[in-house]
Amino acid sequence: MFLVGSLVVLCGLLAQSTAQLAGLPLPLGQGLPLPLGQGLPLPLGQGLPLAVSPALPSNPTDLLAGNFANALSGGLLSGGLLGILENIPLLDVIKSGGGSSNGLVGGLLGKLTSSVPLLNNILDIKITDPRLLELGLVQSPDGHRLYATIPLSLKLQVNMPVVGSFLQLAVKLNITAEIVAMKDNQGRIHLVLGDCTHSPGSLQITLLNGVTPVQSSLDSLTGILTKVLPELIQGKVCPLINGILSGLDVTLVHNIAELLIHGIQFVIKV
């Protein structure tokens, strides 16, 4: 009987001690006891990992503008834009006036040939090193249209005996394409090309190398190129854009078109 009573007292003391110890912090550097074979105590100063809330998914519309710009850029490159620009017979176009009086630049170039003797002294003009730079994308204030800026750079190698050497000119030009959403008679949504033209004032022509020619000759050449190049390059880029829009991913087209139709802004700056 005495032994049973002693055991009861001992168990009570142990239970009380355990309860008191449960309220005390663990000694510094001592981790929670783990079952054998299930790991080591946590390193000094490292507590138990806190529960982390899953990251909220980003707004899907945030990705649309970037995906669309990438699709346009990739389409222009895969469509052979750079090769098309490099193979433009620029001198023939200039001297032929675009092929006819109703051609790309009308009868302007024919008049230039007769009025500017410099053209008759140019043996060749070649387009080299064409590049497509990073596209820009903005949305109209009313949210119903997109404007894609297609920045291009290239070099012109001009063979002019009157100068005595090759001239190399750097050219930069932006083409701006308006893109709108349309529904056909069957209710299907499409992205279509609106206005497509060179951006006014975006043409830059810079002399890169060689002996500086007589200023009047350089001014005359620059004046001719300023009248010819923008429309010529525009005529190569815009049809490609039109074809790219008709071949874009259906889901991408639908998502963008829905936002444009309802005037929802989704382009911040691309």
UniProtKB/Swiss-Prot annotation:
Family (UniProt): Belongs to the BPI/LBP/Plunc superfamily. Plunc family.
Induction: After bulbectomy or lesion of the olfactory bulb.
Cellular component, GO, one term: extracellular space
UniProtKB keywords: Antibiotic, Antimicrobial, Disulfide bond, Glycoprotein, Immunity, Innate immunity, Lipid-binding, Secreted, Signal
Gene: Bpifa1
Protein name per Swiss-Prot or TrEMBL: BPI fold-containing family A member 1
GO BP of this protein: antibacterial humoral response; antimicrobial humoral immune response mediated by antimicrobial peptide; immune response in nasopharyngeal-associated lymphoid tissue; innate immune response; multicellular organismal-level water homeostasis; negative regulation of single-species biofilm formation in or on host organism; regulation of sodium ion transmembrane transport; surfactant homeostasis
A UniProt-annotated Pfam family: LBP_BPI_CETP
Residue ranges, annotated region (Important for surfactant activity and antibacterial properties): 104-109
Carbohydrate attachment residues: N174
Disulphides: C196-C238
Signal peptide region: 1-19
Domain of life: Eukaryota
Membrane-crossing segments per the record: none
GO terms assigned for molecular function: lipid binding
Sections of the chain in a coiled coil: none
UniProt subcellular location: Secreted
Tissue-by-tissue expression: Detected in adult nasal epithelium, heart, lung, spleen, testis and salivary gland, and in embryonic nasal epithelium, lung, salivary gland and thymus.
Quaternary assembly: Monomer. Interacts (via N-terminus) with SCNN1B, a subunit of the heterotrimeric epithelial sodium channel (ENaC); this inhibits proteolytic activation of ENaC.
Main location: secreted
